[in-house]
């Protein structure tokens, strides 16, 4: 009798995210579990969109692995240049490379819903100023949610003061012009003081 193989896909994605964190820590000394926080923020935002079931699972996996090719890009660059130069070179002009590689990588995963272009467009801004110049109505909702969660996590971890980071986030959100996603993020992360 042949036994069917069962895979805990969320556990697998979590393990991959952890492995990517370890590689990133080794290559460029970044040790912050960014993928897990982006996944958590994305899931909080998804509640307000009533995303659940298979869609929520796929959003969580995409958020965990949104930078899955960043280490691939970094390791390729390190073969050419030093760590210091590589960190400086992770500019928006090069951002599209890890999005392209990452989108290609996730096509091999067993998603239950259509996640086409989620990783590819996760650095797009609502006003069309991202690496691929896509406006919000051309970007999948999951990519918009992950982009905003990504920005929020980066801001929250790069500014010391919570008040300053909250003010900066509100300013970014008001300029981002993706009001439905921005609003849900603000609602998901409201604090009594704000």
Tell where the protein language model's regions lie, with residue ranges.
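Active-site-proximal, acidic helix/loop segment immediately C-terminal to a metal-coordinating Asp/Glu
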Residues: 153-178
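Catalytic, metal-anchored helix/loop core of enzyme active sites in primary metabolism
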Residues: 129
């Amino acid at each position: 009798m042949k036994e069917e193989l069962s895979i805990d896909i969320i556990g697998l994605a979590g393990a991959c995210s952890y492995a990517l964190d370890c590689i990133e820590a080794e290559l460029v000394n970044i040790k912050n579990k960014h993928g897990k926080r982006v996944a958590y923020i994305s899931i909080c935002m998804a509640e307000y969109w009533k995303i659940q079931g298979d869609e929520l699972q796929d959003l969580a996996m995409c958020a965990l692995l949104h930078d899955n090719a960043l280490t691939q890009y970094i390791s390729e660059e390190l073969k050419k240049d030093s760590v210091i130069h590589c960190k400086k070179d992770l500019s928006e002009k090069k951002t599209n490379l890890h999005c392209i590689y990452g989108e290609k990588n996730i096509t091999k995963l067993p998603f239950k819903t259509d996640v086409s272009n989620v990783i590819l467009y996760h650095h797009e801004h609502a006003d069309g100023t991202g690496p691929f110049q896509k406006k919000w109505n051309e970007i999948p909702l999951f990519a918009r949610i992950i982009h905003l969660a990504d920005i929020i996590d980066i801001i929250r971890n790069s500014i010391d003061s919570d008040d300053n980071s909250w003010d900066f986030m509100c300013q970014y959100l008001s300029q981002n012009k993706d009001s439905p996603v921005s609003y849900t993020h603000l609602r998901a992360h409201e604090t009594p003081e704000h």
